Amino acid sequence: VEGDTVVAHLDKSHVTVHTYPEYHPDTCLATFRVDIDVATCGEITPLSTLDYLIGSFDSDIITMDYRVRGFTRDVAGKKLFMDHKITSIQDYIDTETLQRYDAVDINVYQANLFHTKMLIKEIDLQNYLFNTDVYELPPKTRLAITDSLRKEMIEVFSGSNIY
């Protein structure tokens, strides 16, 4: 399936969105992945957009990378390779949002690379069913579906085939 590509240039910034729908033939689980690249120049950091972007999607798994590229100069001409404080991407995400997820950081401070992965803690099965009320399903079926969902999420989150 081919789609359209749209790139918008916003003055000194840009946002690019890539979508990846896919379907597993054995488990009947469908996933929809969205990659969003946000780049800014100047005083506005893309980190300030995280709460808005996370709130705009109903995401079960979130993977975020933040990289500081290049440098700027202070008023005396000294190069600044990091012009703001950061130890974790999580520092820029609302506490209420973080409470809904398990979050892990993998950062390379020397290279100004920051990586955070988040996995939803609670699964509301009704959100994953189409044209079916969760209570129409027998308890064992609900449990089996929830188990399949959780296994799929853990594999996507970890980036490896576990089950």
Residue ranges and their predicted role:
Residues 1-163:
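Polybasic/polar functional segments that serve as interface/processing modules
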